[in-house]
Amino acid sequence: MRNILLLFSLTVLLYSCKDKEDPAPDLTFKNRMKDFVIDISHYAKGLDSNFIIIPQNGIELATKDGDDHGEPDLNYLNAIDGNGQEDLFYGYDLDDVATPSEDNAYLRRLLDISKNSGNTILVTDYVSTPGKMDASYQKNADAGYVSFAADHRDLDHIPSYPTPIHNENSETITHLAQAKNFLYLINPEPFSSKADFINAVTATNYDALIMDLFFKDGTTFSAGEINQLKNKANGGKRLVFSYMSIGEAEDYRYYWQSDWATNPPSWLKSVNPDWPGNFKVEYWNPDWQQIIFGNDDSYLKMILEAGFDGVYLDIIDGFEYFE
């Protein structure tokens, strides 16, 4: 009897330890980001049913439990049109260095869940050696992803390699699924004027462009200027998306208040040490969300009025800061 009781006690202890080691994941902050993206999508598509929603990174939101083997979260996946992913094959640890195989495999399992639901995957690899740029394009193509080999992490540059660009074509692109390549150019600092920026982009044949609503002088691109940017050099048309960070506040944006440095709102958190001027936010806070969408003065409404085809949402992985 004593042996039986001892065995029973050990069994209970083992299960108790397992419960402590493997608690159910706290999905609060992931779910709050999902809700934020879904609400942004419903608002935008309510104004323009063809408006395209592409969240970047934070691909764990593709499943209900955030696990790479989890069940697809179709409520979220159906609210978006694609996913952006940085550093998939190159740049995860260092630029121009291959991403570790285990990290690549993990991300691909999640990206494929979104892809298999009908979404388009846009990959940005940070790679500058021509041979590695070729490898990036090939590996992404083999995986069924559309990709851009960025030779500057600041995304302030149109790469001179390869020439012609990967998968160049003269088609008119009206849906994200038609895009065979894209240009990620959100930092206009090297360009002397809007005209200089527009001329540089329209001299290319990329199927899609990700850019900023604002030029470096703080002025917005007009609907007429966005319409110009939709022209490829070869006569085709491209899609144009506006970058918008929803998981961090940026102190150079129009919404930034001068007194926030000494009297910050409750939802404004610590500075991002990797990107000075960027601050973590409680992205579920109604005051922050009101800045982003839902009213005529919001950031997203400005993007819609400028004639962009969609929005490229960044810092989706902002939930990691709070977990």
Question: What is each residue range found by the language model?
Answer:
Residues 1-4:
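Positively charged n-region of N-terminal signal peptides that target proteins for export
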Residues 6-8:
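Sec-dependent N-terminal signal peptides
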Residues 13-16:
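C-terminal motif of bacterial Sec signal peptides marking the signal peptidase cleavage site
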Residues 21-323:
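Glycan-processing catalytic domains of CAZymes
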